[in-house]
Structure formats: structure tokens, C-alpha cells
Amino acid sequence: TGDAAARDAVLRAADLICRTFLDTGRRVREAGSTEMNMAVIHILARLYRDTGRERYLQMARVIEKDWEAEGDYARQGAGNVDFYRQPKPRWESLHDIQGLLELYRITGEEKYKTALVHIWRSIARFDRHNTGGFSTFEQAIGNPYIPGAIETCCTIAWMAMSVYMLKLTGDARVADELELSLLNSVVGMHAASGRWATYNTPMDGVRRASAHDIVFQSREGAPELNCCSVNSARGFGLLGDWALMRDAEGVVLNAYGPGVIRTVLDTGAALTLTQTTDYPRGGRVELAVAPARALTFTLKLRIPRWSRHTRV
């Protein structure tokens, strides 16, 4: 959005983290709940890329070193250890793992890319449920068919990590996973009225407002305010990160559905894509491509892996 106030808030939070830990010699791991508290690594590394402030990278490097005694994500992932077998298989670790992409972008070291790709694939294979939801009782267990709570926040974290994976690899199978999660889990975790979201959206069972399951989080006057109710809508918001993306050759349309997408090509020309369709209910998508001026560019269309007969 270009909201300067929002950016300033993030920078001030990052500066506070640096003053609290980097300037004092204290370690983030000493705060406990390390998979949660160390998740700031991906924000710090991204802020370093955006601002060039060396303190942010230094803080990220300290956290990376402390990973070795906690989640050990980089070494475990690069060593092809599946996520559910790693030391910290809770869902919050996925935000730590997003830091692997940021470190790869900063350093170019393949070990970070290798680790992220392996961890993502192991989750997709062993812990992504048939609904597109992730986790069983808030963590990876290596079996997606065991019934257990599939928490809203866990699925949103899986989708956020998948966006990073898609940006890294451009692999259309990742977009397939995002579509599966969006159209099943994210839609399913919301009441039709929009008033509440679930804590648990099961493969088979009953959907209940999150307030029934995690009432301990409630605040006076706001019984339905909790982590899941404020996080669930992000599943829809993430669509803006992966529906249309760029690669070295042009633009890639990953998501289908009625609507209009506007972007700017590398040439500086504006581009409008309009979809007329009732996808996924129907299989026909009419796409109107309208650049602001006549020009040649590459437009790639994702072919869903479930499609058996596709024509363009």
C-alpha cells in the first residue's frame, strides 16, 4: 500500500528487538518458546534487504546461530530430514523457515534453498491434509490421515510459507497447493455470515466458532477475538501475493476466478487481466488481456494438476 506509518512501525519494532538483544548480548533463545520468538528472523532479514541496515542482518545471524540449539531448520532441512522428524515441528516454526528464503536471497548460498524446498515438500507429502489444511494438534506428525485439530493459524502459516516457496521456485505445483488450501480450508474456516472463524476445520466433523475452542484467549467485551479469528482472513489476503506473479520471461497467472487484476509490466506498461468464469465450479475461463499499449510479452497460465483435459 505504500503506507509509511505501517513501515515505520515495523522498523521501530525491529530496532527495539536489536536494542533488547543485539546491544545487550542477550539471546532470543533465552526468552523461551523459541519457534515463536525466533520467527522474527525472516522479518529482520527482509528489512535488511529493504534498508541495507547492517544491524538487522547481524540480529538475523545471531538468531540463525541459535537455531542450531533449537529448531536447527537450516541444517536439518539441507540434510533431508523431514519436518515432522525435526526438533521443533510445531506450526510456528514455518515462519522461522521463511527466513531461509531471505537468507538465500542475501547470501546466494544453496544450502538455504535446499533446506526450504525439502521442508516444504516433506510437509506437502506427510502433513498436508486432504482439505489443504496443515497440522494435527498444532504440529507436524508425519500422517495426514490421523484425525486431530487442524488449526486455522497452522494452515495460514502453511500458505504463507507456500507463497515463499512459489516465489523461490516458480513451481506450479505450489500454486496447486495454495489453491487447494484457499478453496477448501480458508473458505471452510469462515462462517457464511463472516462473523466468526474456526479454530479447527476438520477433515470430517463439525465446524465451530474459534471462541468455543480457545475461549481462554477472549477479552472482556470481545469473546470472539483470538489468534485464529484475526489470522483467518489472511488466507484470502494472501491471494494478492500469488494470483499473478512475475518471472524472468514475463507474468504468470496462477489463480483463476471471476475478477480483474491490474499490474505493471517490466516495460512500465500497465496491464489489465479480466477473468469471466465460475471457476472452480465450471471449467471454462475467459481471459481478456488488455495492455495499455500494443507490445509483446510472455503470459504463462497455470494448468491445474487435477485437470485431465486442458485446452488453451
Annotate each language-model stretch with its function.
Residues 1-312:
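Glycan-recognition and catalytic cores of secretory/periplasmic carbohydrate-active enzymes
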